[in-house]
Amino acid sequence: MNDSEFHRLADALWLTIEERLDSWDGDSDIDCEINGGVLTLSFENGSKIIINRQEPLHQVWLATKQGGYHFDLKGDEWICDRSGETFWELLEQAATQQAGEKVSFR
């Protein structure tokens, strides 16, 4: 994968997160902001989830209250380089915990 392909895929990931939050009808308020290629989800309790791209490594990084995760693209899924879990699994787990209610991005 070259840098432009990586950015195209990361942009698509960011857009999917934004679209799914826009259509989410949960009770909690989750704000989504993109600044300089970094996507920040802010929760009512003041906690945040930070998602950013690491261009030199062609990785997506996820920072949550539970810890930090690095994802490599394998096929058509972003997979954690430590646990083997998908990006969506770990994002949903963290968002659910931080929102205090079930959050789904799929």
From Swiss-Prot:
Organism field: Salmonella paratyphi B (strain ATCC BAA-1250 / SPB7)
HAMAP family found in the cross-reference section: CyaY
Organism ancestry: Bacteria, Pseudomonadati, Pseudomonadota, Gammaproteobacteria, Enterobacterales
GO BP terms in the entry: iron-sulfur cluster assembly
Known role: Involved in iron-sulfur (Fe-S) cluster assembly. May act as a regulator of Fe-S biogenesis.
An annotated GO cellular component: cytosol
GO molecular-function term, one example from the UniProt record: ferric iron binding
UniProt keyword list: Iron, Metal-binding
Record-given protein name: Iron-sulfur cluster assembly protein CyaY
